[in-house]
Amino acid sequence: MKEQWLEKVIERNRLGNCQIEIINSVIKKQWECDLLIEDEVHLFASPSFSTIFNVVKYKLILCLTGTLERLDGKEELIKKYAPVCDKITMDEAVKNGWVSPFTEYVVMIKTDLTEYNELNKRFNAYFSYFGWDFQTAMKSVQDVFFRKKWCKENNLNFKEATAMTYDWMRCLRLRKQFVQSHPKKIEIARKIINARKDKKILTFSATIADAEKIGTGLVLHSKQSKKLNEKILEEFKQMKSGVINSSKALITGCDIEGLDTEIILSINSSKITKTQSVGRAIRFSPGKKAEIFTLIIAGTQEFGWWRNSKTSSNYVIIDEEQLDDILAGNEIQSRKIDDNSNINFRF
């Protein structure tokens, strides 16, 4: 990110009165400036990063982010120092030519849900013990002192509550693993890659292991050295077509010229993650129209996660047969979801 900002500042011959630093360095000492610009400001709500508002003395502040909303609600801290003054939707950005036009194909994958349904049944049974309160259940997992206090306040047996807590967490993890790392997604991803051999493709998977299972193209992840990852990324940037596979390492701040196809094998409810991942493929380039393929296991909670995370109306929900038509260059009948549902799919 710092390198990208530096490149743009040098292009505009503004290096003389502009200093670019990463947040980790800024919070270590006192600063003074006329204008403070904070990019990816949604990250600055953490206890350490939020000290930037105290260590920097500024006259004006400009904060930028793809999506300010956080699942933990801590964006309110940022708003205290920098209230929202303008909001640009993805549709508006496309209309004004700030990003390239794109279509997101939401591929609903049908598969045997026997295992998932059993996990979901057990998950709901354990969840009901906590009154369907996610925060209570999660705090019980993370904080034994909270669990003891909660048991005392509700006249519950601590040993039983502990068992329920970890059984609930286990089912939550296994249910998520079932949908995010399903083998059928690897199969569909390979099909898309084979049909788009002339494209520059980025894939996002739930885990490093899943990224490696795709079995074609380059793999970039956090367990490799920074030097090796830089070499891999530079190699991909020089390619006219090809594939680079990742889990989370390329979600933020990566600018790859020519990237026009993205396959998302793993999603959650976060608008931030969704906006940033889609942003990799829609960086503006004249004449480019990007394709985003989001793979979802039909009949599971994953569809609700996608619905909560979506930030654009440029989507088409399709099945596997319709995907085959799209990959073959044929027209399909599009359909959109009913957004009037009041069901909470967050978890």
Segments from the language model and where they lie:
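Inter-Walker segment of RecA-like/P-loop motor cores
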Residues: 2-32
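Inter-lobe connector of SF1/SF2 helicase motors
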Residues: 100-165
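Long, largely alpha-helical accessory region at the distal end of helicase-like NTP-driven motors
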Residues: 148-153, 317-347
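Post-DEXD/H (motif II) to motif III coupling segment of the RecA-like Helicase ATP-binding lobe
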Residues: 42-104
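Conserved interdomain hinge at the start of the Helicase C-terminal
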Residues: 118-128, 170-213
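A short beta-strand element within the Helicase C-terminal
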Residues: 33-39, 245-246, 252-268, 273-276, ...
